[in-house]
Amino acid sequence: MKVVIELFGASRDFSNKNLIELDIKNNSTIKDLRGKILDYLDLNFKGNKNFIKIVNSSAFCSNNNIISDNYKITNNEKIAI
């Protein structure tokens, strides 16, 4: 399934569009999404260590609510970091 990740703060450097779109497996969690974002950073920014720190320390939210690493993502859901 496809998920749109809206980028805020320091994570805006991950894309010039202020968002990234990733394909993830059904029933993926925020923890899984962190891994996909790290894969994206490795591919596009050669594993930039500062970007990795941002992903590992950032909170995620959906519908203006902070969500935990075990939160299950739904299809076409917008997630923010």
Question: How does the language model describe each region?
Answer:
Residues 1-81:
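Ubiquitin-like/PB1-type beta-grasp interaction modules and other compact soluble beta-rich domains
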